[in-house]
Amino acid sequence: MSNNPKIPFSFKKLTSRNYSVLKDELLELYLQAFTTGEYAQYVSRKDASWKLDEIQSIGSGVAAMLHGKPAGALMGIPFALDTDFPAENHPHIPMEKTVYIAELMVHEDVRGQGIASALIHEFLENEKEKGITDAVIRVWIENIPAVKLYEKLGFRRIEEITQTKFKSETETFEMKKIYLHKKLK
């Protein structure tokens, strides 16, 4: 169970087996989190499925389970695999000992209940056991609730990039994103 009294959830590591069992629900969670609401962008079901499979194949993750279903999930990869980050500008970040939080998603019905914070904490504790010393996350600068959460959890802004994303299947827009870094203790 979580330490947060607001909502009784448990954690499940996203092992290959657990991921296979939860894949369809994680895909629905991903699509709900990233393609609906105020911060929506267009991502096809096929592309989302491929992305989750790719992250799972090279990274690790954890799900927050509520009533037997994933209410949230966090998936990370080795930071050295994030080709968008201008590593040459940040030689103080040890790329081989840094995890990149590639996806963090919480179902809209349970946002604000401490799930994202708990997922980040649980995931980073697991990563520290593997010798990871740093963590980085990237977020759309306009997603103020997420930016505030990450900063509250000790992440500090280190870089900005602009990415072209899809608003619809054919219409694009420019999304300014920020990278935030945290030294793990």
Model-identified regions with their sequence ranges:
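Conserved N-terminal entry element of GNAT/NAT acetyltransferase domains
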Residues: 1-28, 32, 185
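Conserved beta-strand-loop-alpha-helix junction that forms the acyl-donor binding cleft
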Residues: 111, 137-147, 163-168, 173
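Conserved GNAT acetyl-CoA-binding A-motif
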Residues: 127-139
